[in-house]
Amino acid sequence: MAGLKNTPYNAVHWSQLAPEEQIRFWEDYEAGRATTFLVEPERKRTKRRRGEHSTKPKCENPSWYRPERYKALKGQLGHAYNRLVKKDPVTGEQSLRMRMSRHPFYVQKRTFVGRKYAFRPEKQRLLDAIWPVLVSFSDAGTHTVGMSVTRLAEEISPKDSEGHVIPELEVTVSRLSRLLAEQVRFGVLGVSEETMWDREHRQRLPRYVWITPAGWQMLGVDMVKLHEQQQKRLRESEIRQQLIREGVLREDEDISVHAARKRWYLQRSQDALKKRREKAAASKRANRLKKLPVDQQIYEMAEYLRKRLPPDEAYFCSDDHLKRLAIRELRQLELTLAAPPPH
């Protein structure tokens, strides 16, 4: 029995082997190569090897606070943000007041989402940094964060003096997407129910998240006041006014949070589709024009703009003004022109 202590858990008894393998086992046993009656199954051969690359994230310590030019959040949203972030009255420097990654809720629900241990330090810092962003850009009526996952990753990434994301220090979309997906499993965030497929670009439309009641309770807000402010904002929302104008709702009817959230996501999906179509058309136009001489580029773009100007504006538009518009449009298409635009 001494030989049974170090045997693997998935080892099987020799009697359970195939006849050919039993013969091979007894040959090994008689030769002294087998010391136990339990046989470890042959491991699957693979060419996978641990790489030498670093697994550290690009941005190990992200942080985000509301800029001074932003208006202060009102109601319970402002209360939630102030519970997350504090401001030094002397220096004006902002820092975290509460770290959401250390909330007891994550410890209580850890096993329900398939976790055994606490968050790693890198994930803790990312989770602490993303919650002020979620609260800051959350709509008071639908509690939907008005940024897609890609836009959230760009917002939280470090930027240079010109406001551009530093590629070496960015928070990648895949990393943030995995974090938000785990928050959805915890039940503190919700995700847009339907993700439409864009057939032309062969990719899905942006996904949006919203803060659930469990998430607001973690932030320590007054749920009664939060619900009252939410209903008031929904009654004043543009989405409700659109439904009233379309005859879907009456003047005395209120819109539900689910319906408002679904309508909001539909509008964002349509805006994304429209923007992608315009970008694709501009790309095709640029590919066609870049093969032409500069003068021909300006002429083709001027004729294109002339057809799309309103009739009253096209009537009073001079050739010089139309040429300036064409050059400006060509520069927006990132086509190199030989001469600068006339002033």
Swiss-Prot record:
Region (Disordered): 42-61
Keyword field: DNA replication, Plasmid
Keyword Transcription regulation included in the entry's annotation: no
GO BP annotations, alphabetical order: DNA replication; plasmid maintenance
UniProt KW Plastid keyword: no
Functional description taken from the UniProt entry: Probably functions as an initiator for the IncI1 ColIb-P9 replicon.
The name this protein goes by in its record: Replication initiation protein
Gene: repZ
